[in-house]
Amino acid sequence: MVHSQEVVIGPDRRLRVTLEVEQGKLRSWAVQLEWWDPEEGRPVWVARYDTAGGRDHRDRNRIASHEPVDLPEDRGEAARVAERELSLKAEEYIEAYRAAKAQGRKAW
């Protein structure tokens, strides 16, 4: 079963948290920072931590994909750490995204 939740962390930003639970165990997860891009007139994903491909990693839109990260082995704790990281450093991630966009780097 997949559980999704949006957590508003500011007037122009939110976290999208997705947990896949099977037989009471957390199988996979993703925590994504989204920001309202005034130039595009819509929310865009800026950064996310997830378990796609079987390994915990971070993706940063326009910057890097599948960056290795040091997270706890426990999947639930790893998801909580990722959520805290994106919440606390949201401004840094958004500014890096904006800089990459200004340089003409492509979104994906």
Q: What name fits each language-model region?
A:
Residues 1, 15-18, 50, 60-64, ...:
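Small/flexible residues
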Residues 61-108:
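Acidic, low-complexity intrinsically disordered segments
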Residues 12, 26, 55-56, 106:
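Compositionally biased, intrinsically disordered low-complexity regions
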Residues 6-10, 24, 57, 61, ...:
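Amphipathic, alpha-helical segments enriched in basic
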Residues 10-12, 49, 97:
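Compositionally biased, intrinsically disordered low-complexity segments
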Residues 28-68:
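A short, structured beta-strand/loop element
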Residues 1-39:
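Negatively charged, low-complexity tracts enriched in Asp/Glu with abundant Ser/Thr
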